[in-house]
Amino acid sequence: MIQYLKLFLVIFSGLSFLIFGYLCFFSLYFKNEFIRYGIPNFRKTTGFFQSLGGVSLIIGVFIEQLAVIASVGLTILMILGVIVRLKIKDGLLKTMPAIFYAFLNALIFYLFLND
């Protein structure tokens, strides 16, 4: 049962970050959000690491060490996202996705370590 949960969480998070990474490169909304965050120069870098993390999580289904590294990296990335949201005084509703994905990837990390 835990294996199916882990697989679902990895695929869900991996696909989510592939989408987020793509949007960082091509979405006007995301471009404007990074301007609002005060870090417009980090948009493409963030998109790259989100895409890399998403791909690595999915490949990590077969190469577990890669999933462990990706889940740690994405957890850190989302913690940084929470910090940015706090810095610009975004409300809880706008901060919740970053909190959710930070916890999700921390859980994925935990599940791989305790397999």
Regions found by a protein language model. Name each.
Residues 2-115:
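Membrane-interface extramembranous regions
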